[in-house]
């Protein structure tokens, strides 16, 4: 079993009767995830976009197997588009009682949807959320070239509310004829609008997804904005709101300098010119590939699975936690400052020097494709190398 990293101590605070613990290192996230499953006594619910049958996947597989042998009910949902691991890999666990479902896109509107959510829940008592998947590259270190990401452990009454959402989503996933209208109903029924901790969701709804509406609404009154966005290609309306904060207060964005999809970097850079003009500070994270999804708006935090891009805003099934708490926001601003210190400041002069006409054309084309097509398509086209 992997050991928790000693370089990043757990950061933990209580908010509205729930214990929130931030996990910043890949190895400590994997250790915490395995412990969550091993400590379960009644139920384990897992939901991931990617599940790869590598070393990390095997460790989680074995933890699920141990849970099943203890008599724990175990459920696993993965996405067909994101997870290439064949169903046969999980067959021995299914034979032992695993409830296994795969989000299958079909032709029509449902084909466009990805189940991009990530969570691991035990006993309706504790849940781990974040942007990471089940794959070695999400649990390593910067020296390994692993993704930089975040995990958040939530322990308390908020977990039971999320469990009911999971069960409704699992029922819809197992129904191959499930209607988009039914899915919309699930998203809106479980989306929360009150309290210090609010579960907010995304999906194929009309207009912005509920989580995106909450974020956009919070932006309107914000004076101090900090965003870490691995894939940054939002709507022009959201870009304008960020720009207004840049003019009247302070707005800072950390985007990726490294990725496995160069088109997403180019698409983000396409937005820089207008943001820099409005006083927004932009940084690119240097140590390794960036996968973090974090928004800090004054004393409000949005953290979870969704990128600030068109798919995350309108289409993908996403899960975010909105946290309204000054102490927790202060802790997250401290984390943000640490990431800024490891990032390259993008000045207007630097952006101009590295943005010739051909580069600008590639950026515009990448922005168009990222906001209209699937990431897999842009990754295969490899447009963003420049």
Regions found by a protein language model. Name each.
Residues 1-386:
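Charged, low-complexity intrinsically disordered terminal segments
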């Amino acid at each position: 079993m992997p050991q928790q990293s000693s370089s990043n101590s757990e950061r933990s605070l209580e908010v509205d009767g729930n214990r929130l613990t931030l996990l910043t290192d890949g190895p400590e996230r994997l250790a915490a995830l395995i412990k969550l499953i091993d400590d379960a006594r009644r139920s384990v619910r897992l939901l991931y976009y990617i599940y790869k049958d590598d070393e990390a996947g095997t460790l989680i597989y074995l933890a699920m197997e141990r849970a099943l042998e203890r008599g724990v009910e175990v459920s696993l949902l993965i996405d067909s588009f994101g997870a290439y691991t064949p169903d046969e890999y999980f067959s021995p666990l299914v034979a032992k009682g695993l409830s296994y479902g795969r989000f299958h896109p079909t032709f029509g509107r449902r084909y466009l949807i990805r189940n991009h959510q990530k969570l691991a829940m035990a006993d309706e008592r504790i849940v781990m959320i974040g942007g990471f998947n089940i794959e070695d590259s999400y649990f390593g270190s910067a020296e390994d070239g692993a993704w930089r990401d975040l995990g958040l452990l939530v322990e308390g009454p908020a977990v039971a509310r999320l469990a009911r959402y999971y069960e409704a989503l699992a029922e819809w996933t197992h129904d191959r004829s499930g209607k988009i209208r039914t899915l919309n109903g699930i998203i809106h029924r479980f989306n929360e609008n009150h309290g210090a901790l609010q579960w907010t969701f995304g999906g194929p709804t009309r207009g912005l997804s509920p989580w995106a509406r909450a974020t956009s609404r919070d932006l309107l009154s914000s004076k101090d904005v900090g965003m870490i966005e691995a894939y940054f290609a939002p709507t022009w309306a959201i870009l304008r709101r960020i720009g207004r904060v840049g003019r009247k207060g302070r707005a800072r964005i950390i985007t990726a300098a490294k990725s496995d999809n160069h088109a997403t970097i180019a698409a983000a850079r396409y937005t820089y010119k207008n943001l820099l003009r409005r006083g927004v500070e932009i940084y690119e994270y240097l140590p390794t590939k960036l996968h973090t999804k974090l928004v800090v708006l004054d004393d409000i935090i949005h953290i979870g699975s969704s990128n600030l891009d068109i798919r995350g805003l309108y289409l993908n099934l996403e899960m975010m936690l909105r946290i309204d708490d000054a102490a927790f926001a202060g802790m997250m601003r401290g984390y943000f400052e640490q990431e800024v210190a490891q990032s390259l400041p993008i000045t207007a002069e630097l952006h101009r020097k590295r943005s010739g006409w051909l580069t600008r054309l590639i950026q515009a084309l990448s922005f168009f494709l990222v906001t209209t097509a699937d990431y897999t398509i842009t990754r295969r086209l490899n447009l963003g190398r420049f």
